[in-house]
Structures are given as structure tokens and as C-alpha cells.
């Protein structure tokens, strides 16, 4: 059995990244694909579940895990720590399961420096106007927060060229097909196929 592939997925807020990942996983069995669940020191919000939305831990324990090198990447945001478990990702990949990591460009750089074999995908909105419309339609943020997110979006988008693949999420169904095509193509690469079908290849090449 071959290793799974780590997919780094980034996008400005409102581009549809989380929806695309969720739709992809809904159509595929969990033994083939999983989303990485980050550790965090922030409090649990209503409706959240430990181990589903985040692994909620105390700050002291998080700092202890940093010291042990347990995280592929971590960051402090508004006084709370967030980190990606190295052990969980490596164990999951070793089972032949693809892992999707929803992360910003800074975290993506940290991951790529340690796991250069990871594949990266950037999701773009078709326009600034459409991005702002989507943020307003969600009804989750105030005008001030939306203005802040739009400012952050320009910075995030400026790093699209650091990624292996770029998907334009204009039509959701088309973007999802593009997402699936990337995964399919990666699974058909020679090294993946050779590992998956080693016995068959040996038989084909036998005298």
C-alpha cells in the first residue's frame, strides 16, 4: 500500500474553500480521505465538538507539545494557539489516506519546508465584488469585520503563485470537478500506481 498525499488548501475567507473540502469528502469514503483537525487553546464554542472541529487543549499542554516537536506548524492568533499535529498527519498518510489541510499561506510555507512532497491548492474567487457579496450573504460578520477580511484577502491572494494548483470558484460545481480532477491526477502518478499495483506489475514483468 502506498502513502496518502497531503493537500494544503488555502484561500481568502469567503472563497468557498471549506465548502469545497466538505463536498469532496461527502462524496468519498473516510478511509480514503480525511481533513486534518487542528489543536487549539481557545475555548469551545456552542455546537463544537472536541476532536471534530478542533482538539481543545490547555495552553500549558500546547506549549509542552511545541517543545516535543509535535506540530508541523503552529501560530498564536489573538492570544490563542493553533497547531497541526505532525504525528496524526504522518500516521494517517502512512495508512494510504489522503489528508486535507485547510491553512493560510504562512502555515502552508511552514508545512512545505518540512514536507516538500505535499501538494498545494489555492482557491480564488472570480472577483473582489463576488467575494464581498459572499461575505455579506453569510451573515456572520459585521461591516467592519467584512472590510477587514477584504483587506486580508488581497494579502492572501498575492501568494497564489506559491501553490501547485489554482481553482477559480465561480461556479461551485465546476470548481468541485476541478478539485476532484487534481486528486484523481495525483493518484494516477507513476509512483502512486507502482505502489498500489506492485503485485500486478511484478506479474506482468515476470518471465
Curated annotation (Swiss-Prot):
Superkingdom classification of source:
Bacteria
Outline the extent of the Guanylate kinase-like domain.
Answer: 4-184
Can you provide one Gene Ontology molecular function annotated for this UniProt record? guanylate kinase activity
User: What pathway is this protein a component of?
Assistant: Purine metabolism
**Reaction(s) catalysed (UniProt annotation):** GMP + ATP = GDP + ADP; dZMP + ATP = dZDP + ADP
Checking InterPro entries in the record gives: GK/Ca_channel_bsu (IPR008145), Guanylate_kin-like_dom (IPR008144), Guanylate_kinase (IPR017665), Guanylate_kinase_CS (IPR020590), P-loop_NTPase (IPR027417)
**One GO CC annotation:** cytosol
Q: What class of enzyme is it?
A: transferase
Alphabetically sorted, this entry's keywords are: ATP-binding, Cytoplasm, Kinase, Nucleotide-binding, Transferase
The UniProt family comment states: Belongs to the guanylate kinase family.
> Any idea what job this protein has?
Essential for recycling GMP and indirectly, cGMP. (Microbial infection) Catalyzes the phosphorylation of dZMP to dZDP, when the bacterium is infected by a phage that produces the substrate for the synthesis of dZTP (2- amino-2'-deoxyadenosine 5'-triphosphate), which is then used by the phage as a DNA polymerase substrate.
Q: What is this protein called?
A: Guanylate kinase
Amino acid at each position: 500500500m502506498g502513502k496518502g498525499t497531503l493537500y494544503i488548501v488555502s484561500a481568502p475567507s469567503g472563497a468557498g474553500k471549506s465548502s469545497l473540502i466538505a463536498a469532496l469528502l461527502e462524496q468519498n469514503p473516510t478511509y480514503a480521505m480525511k481533513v486534518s483537525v487542528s489543536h487549539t487553546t481557545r475555548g469551545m464554542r456552542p455546537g463544537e465538538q472536541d476532536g471534530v472541529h478542533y482538539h481543545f487543549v490547555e495552553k500549558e499542554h500546547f506549549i509542552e507539545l511545541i517543545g516535543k516537536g509535535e506540530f508541523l506548524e503552529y501560530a498564536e492568533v489573538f492570544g490563542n494557539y493553533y497547531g497541526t499535529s505532525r504525528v496524526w498527519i504522518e500516521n494517517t498518510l502512512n495508512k494510504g489516506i489522503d489528508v486535507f489541510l485547510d491553512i493560510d499561506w504562512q502555515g502552508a510555507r511552514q508545512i512545505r519546508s518540512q514536507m516538500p512532497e505535499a501538494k498545494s491548492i489555492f482557491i480564488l474567487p472570480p472577483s473582489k465584488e463576488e467575494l464581498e457579496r459572499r461575505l455579506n450573504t453569510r451573515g456572520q460578520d459585521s461591516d467592519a469585520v467584512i472590510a477587514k477580511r477584504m483587506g486580508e484577502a488581497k494579502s492572501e491572494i498575492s501568494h497564489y503563485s506559491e501553490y501547485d494548483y489554482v481553482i477559480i470558484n465561480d461556479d461551485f460545481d465546476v470548481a468541485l470537478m476541478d478539485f476532484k480532477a487534481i486528486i484523481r491526477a495525483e493518484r494516477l502518478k507513476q509512483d502512486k500506481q507502482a505502489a498500489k499495483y506492485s503485485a500486478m506489475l511484478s506479474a506482468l514483468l515476470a518471465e
